[in-house]
């Protein structure tokens, strides 16, 4: 990519770079995850308020290498006001994308799922789990681990309600346990496939499944946002 026109984007993370610049990690509509240098302004001023997470932007990136230049940016005035547990859930989603997406590989479905997740999280009384799971499953699909949860991966047999199955990144849905596999009941797999979170226990089962898969892909790298969420929940519960 040499230079593209304005495209929708969200800030995932920013960090100081050299004496008076910042590197801003973005999830963009056209180019996927991109890192760009924001020049000038000085450390004392920090990153401009419009370049904060959970604010929809239009950005123009330039440069030939993997590290781009942030040539132009403007807000669309769409902001997702996350607070409390929803804020830490949003930081978790941002950290996942920073650590697992490859740079400059278009991933429109992940971008759309991210927007949808922010909508879930910004509701007045948000149900965090559906919003989190939506982005996690889109990310797994993007990374090449999308699975039809309604069929056994090796045999093609239809998943049955009353049978316990094993799921792993390498083997998908199976009746045979594998290293790092997680046990999921058949009716929960069917609910997960249809994103039918009204089925009791389906969200909990989906969380166990995505947690195991994402931890394996992270390869032992910690997620700081998880620790922040634990600390917050511990504090609020007294």
Swiss-Prot record:
One Pfam family here: RecO_C
Stated family: Belongs to the RecO family.
Keywords: DNA damage, DNA recombination, DNA repair
GO cellular component: bacterial nucleoid
Database matches in NCBIfam families: reco
Biological process per Gene Ontology, one example term: double-strand break repair
Protein's name in the database: DNA repair protein RecO
Residue runs in coiled coils: none
Free-text function comment from the UniProt entry: Involved in DNA repair and RecF pathway recombination.
Source lineage: Bacteria, Pseudomonadati, Pseudomonadota, Gammaproteobacteria, Oceanospirillales
Gene3D superfamilies linked: Nucleic acid-binding proteins, Recombination protein O, C-terminal domain
Gene encoding the protein: recO
């Amino acid at each position: 990519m040499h230079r593209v026109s304005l495209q929708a984007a969200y800030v995932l993370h920013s960090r100081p770079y050299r004496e008076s610049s910042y590197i801003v990690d973005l999830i963009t509509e056209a180019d996927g995850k991109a890192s760009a240098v924001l020049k000038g302004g000085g450390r004392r001023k920090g990153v401009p308020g419009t370049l904060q997470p959970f604010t929809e932007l239009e950005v123009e990136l330039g440069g030939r290498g993997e590290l781009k230049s942030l040539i132009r940016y403007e807000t669309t005035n769409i902001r997702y006001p996350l607070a409390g547990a929803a804020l830490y859930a949003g930081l978790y989603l941002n950290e996942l994308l920073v650590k697992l997406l490859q740079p400059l590989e278009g991933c429109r479905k992940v971008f759309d799922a991210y927007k949808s997740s922010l909508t879930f999280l910004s509701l007045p009384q948000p149900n965090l789990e559906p919003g989190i799971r939506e982005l996690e499953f889109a990310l797994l699909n993007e990374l090449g681990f999308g699975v039809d949860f309604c069929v056994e991966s090796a045999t093609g047999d239809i998943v049955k309600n009353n049978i316990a199955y094993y799921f792993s990144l390498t083997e998908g849905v199976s009746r045979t346990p594998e290293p790092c596999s997680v046990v999921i009941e058949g009716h929960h797999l069917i609910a997960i496939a249809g994103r039918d979170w009204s089925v009791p226990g389906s969200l909990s089962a989906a969380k166990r499944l995505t947690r195991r898969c994402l931890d394996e892909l992270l390869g032992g790298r910690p997620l700081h946002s998880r620790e922040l969420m634990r600390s917050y929940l511990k504090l609020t519960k007294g």
